[in-house]
Amino acid sequence: LGIYSDAGTQTCSK
């Protein structure tokens, strides 16, 4: 939940 970095990209997930 929240913002996490994946493979150097920022993704917003609820």
Curated annotation (Swiss-Prot):
Catalysed reactions, as listed in the record: Hydrolysis of terminal, non-reducing alpha-D-galactose residues in alpha-D-galactosides, including galactose oligosaccharides, galactomannans and galactolipids
GO molecular-function term, one example from the UniProt record: alpha-galactosidase activity
Plastid as UniProt keyword: no
Known EC number: 3.2.1.22
Keywords attached to this entry: Disulfide bond, Glycosidase, Hydrolase
Family: Belongs to the glycosyl hydrolase 27 family.
Protein name (record): Alpha-galactosidase
Organism: Capsicum annuum var. annuum
Taxonomic classification: Eukaryota, Viridiplantae, Streptophyta, Embryophyta, Tracheophyta
